UniProtKB/Swiss-Prot annotation:
Family recorded in the similarity comment: Belongs to the PlsX family.
Organism domain of life: Bacteria
PANTHER family: FATTY ACID/PHOSPHOLIPID SYNTHESIS PROTEIN PLSX, PHOSPHATE ACYLTRANSFERASE
EC number annotated for this UniProt entry: 2.3.1.274
Keyword annotations from UniProtKB, A to Z: Cytoplasm, Lipid biosynthesis, Lipid metabolism, Phospholipid biosynthesis, Phospholipid metabolism, Transferase
Lineage: Bacteria, Pseudomonadati, Bacteroidota, Cytophagia, Cytophagales
The protein, known as: Phosphate acyltransferase
Protein purpose: Catalyzes the reversible formation of acyl-phosphate (acyl-PO(4)) from acyl-[acyl-carrier-protein] (acyl-ACP). This enzyme utilizes acyl-ACP as fatty acyl donor, but not acyl-CoA.
Cellular component terms per the entry's GO annotation: cytoplasm
Pathways involved: Lipid metabolism; phospholipid metabolism
InterPro entries assigned to the protein according to its UniProt record, in alphabetical order: FA_synthesis (IPR003664), Phospholipid_synth_PlsX-like (IPR012281)
UniProt enzyme class: transferase
Species the sequence originates in: Cytophaga hutchinsonii (strain ATCC 33406 / DSM 1761 / CIP 103989 / NBRC 15051 / NCIMB 9469 / D465)
């Protein structure tokens, strides 16, 4: 299994990325290889100063970098030799099984939409986030930022996509799907959620439990939480602050530690023809390591194929 990693993406690249790659190489199953994409000489210089298992790390040269502040569409089209563009080329040509980056999120979305492209039948791909639950596991939240404005049909697709991910990656046989709303009653909500509710409840392939409220985010009520990207991104960013708050106050709590972005590593873009994971711009080596482990799980579970089958 060949897992590609953008060595130039992130606020602390390439050092933190390369350190994370070595941590992943030390801990991933034996069939995994890591392909670092970026400026080869710079990558080799960093590798030479670090200890760890480097035998499963290869390098693909890319002499351009898409900066965090660059316009995603313009940068992706004008920098075909950037580490992100090269990563998507390798993924499209099936030379790698997954592509991960902590770089420009917009460019990663552009690559997903216009390079490997959405799966036929999928209106728009969604980004999946992960919300800690009192039980000690995570619930999938989709969408958390790919689509600020959504159509009801998109939320219905997110319900299916999120359910497939939860079943095959988390191993939950009949995941409970909830629609994030301002009340449990079916007649409550916005024009979007009212229409989406009617579409989702007609889906025989998922276990829809109806609307859920903000107070249900952490109480194990739903395994999949469906929402538009605007709402989901607010939920995700709010959750990230919990770990910062308790850490500053000197608390060490197992539940709140799950809100540490490093523990998850990244967020998959679901509904496209390939395995793509985006990481936090401030990703540490630990976060990169966990993002690579997530890429391994995503690839092993064959989520893209499962989604294709659902819409074939």
């Amino acid at each position: 299994m060949r897992l590609a990693l953008d060595a130039m993406g992130g606020d602390f690249a390439p050092k933190a990325i390369i350190e994370g790659a070595i941590l992943a190489s030390d801990s991933l199953p034996a069939d995994a290889e890591i392909i670092l994409i970026g400026k080869e000489q710079l990558i080799r210089e960093h590798l030479s100063t670090l200890e760890g298992n480097k035998s499963r790390i290869q390098i693909v040269h890319a002499d351009e970098v898409i900066g965090m502040a660059e316009h995603p569409t313009k940068a992706f089209s004008q920098k075909p030799n950037s580490s992100i563009a090269v990563g998507f080329h390798l993924l499209k040509q099936k030379e790698v099984d997954a592509f991960c980056s902590a770089g420009n999120t917009g460019a990663m979305l552009v690559g997903s939409m216009f390079s490997i492209k959405p799966i036929e039948g999928i209106l728009r791909p969604g980004i999946a986030g992960f919300m800690p639950q009192e039980s000690g596991r995570f619930a999938v939240v989709i969408d958390v930022g790919a689509n600020a404005d959504c159509k009801p049909e998109m939320l219905a697709q997110f319900a299916v996509i999120g359910s497939l991910y939860t079943k095959y990656v988390f191993g939950i046989e009949n995941p409970k799907v909830g629609l994030m709303n301002l009340g449990e009653e079916e007649e409550k909500g916005t024009i979007l959620t009212l229409a989406a509710h009617q579409l989702i409840k007609e889906l025989d392939s998922i276990n829809f439990i109806g609307n859920i409220e903000g107070r249900d985010l952490f109480n194990n009520k739903a395994d999949v939480i469906v929402c538009d990207g605007y709402t989901g991104n607010i939920i995700l960013k709010m959750g990230e602050t919990f770990y910062d708050l308790v850490s500053k106050r000197g608390y060490d709590d197992t539940f709140f530690n799950m809100f540490n972005y490093e523990e998850v590593g990244g967020s998959p873009i679901l509904g496209v023809n390939g395995n793509v994971i985006i990481g936090h711009g401030i990703s540490s080596p630990k976060a990169i390591k966990n993002m690579m482990h997530q890429a391994y799980q995503l690839t092993q579970a064959k989520i893209s194929e499962k989604i294709k089958n659902a819409y074939s």
